[in-house]
Amino acid sequence: MLDLLRSQGDNRVIKLTQAFKRDLRWFDKFLCDYNGVSMYYHKSVDHTVELDACLEGLGAVWNSHVYHLPIPLHYQNLGIVHLEMVNILVATKTFGPFWAHHKVLIKCDNQAVVQVLVNGRTRDPFLATCARNIWQVAAKFDVELVYQHIHGIHNPIADLLSRWTNHHSDFVKLYTYVDNPIWLNVNIDLLEMDCNI
């Protein structure tokens, strides 16, 4: 919205772009869920989630909760940047109700994805749709999301989960990082996005 308004200068008539209209739909949907109270601006992080995506799957760890989700056929043509963003959406939808009224640090090893979510800007329509869906879930549950880029070498648990094979060695590695992991069955429907916002 703001980019369009800034680019118009002093023109009196502005032709609304599709992106502008999607932003308006986002606000319209948000207002239906909004209860009028916001608890944002927490001083410290309450929860940390680490995520990773690869061409085989998505993985995340939050506290002792973990998941692995194989990439569905209709997403196998996506690049790694898109898969990383989809994984953040899946994590936000999965854990959002548990994070209500808290500040959450999302650690991701993809710098481009972190930049989109921190700056709120991208020219990629798919990334923009994912970002709006992430922000919609965060707004619905009054979650303040902050993002941090971490190098892949510092993200071993999520990396292991994204490449999960159910092999004995995977379980041994996981148990060295997480005591008594709680496996979540992530519903494939969480990959669906509202493309109208």
Regions inferred by a protein language model and the residue ranges of each:
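An acidic- and aromatic-residue-enriched active-site/binding cleft used to recognize and process polar
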Residues: 53-56, 63-66, 109-111, 150-153
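C-terminal reverse transcriptase regions that engage the nucleic-acid substrate
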Residues: 1-39
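Eukaryotic intrinsically disordered and solvent-exposed regulatory patches
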Residues: 33-37, 46, 91-93, 132-134
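Flexible, low-complexity interdomain linkers flanking nucleic-acid-processing modules
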Residues: 143, 160-197
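RNase H catalytic domain
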Residues: 93-156
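Mobile genetic element proteins and their domesticated derivatives, centered on retroelements
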Residues: 1-2, 27, 50-52, 60, ...
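A short, polar/acidic, helix/strand-boundary loop motif
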Residues: 63-86, 94, 111-128
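Two-metal-ion RNase H-like nuclease active-site motif
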Residues: 41-55
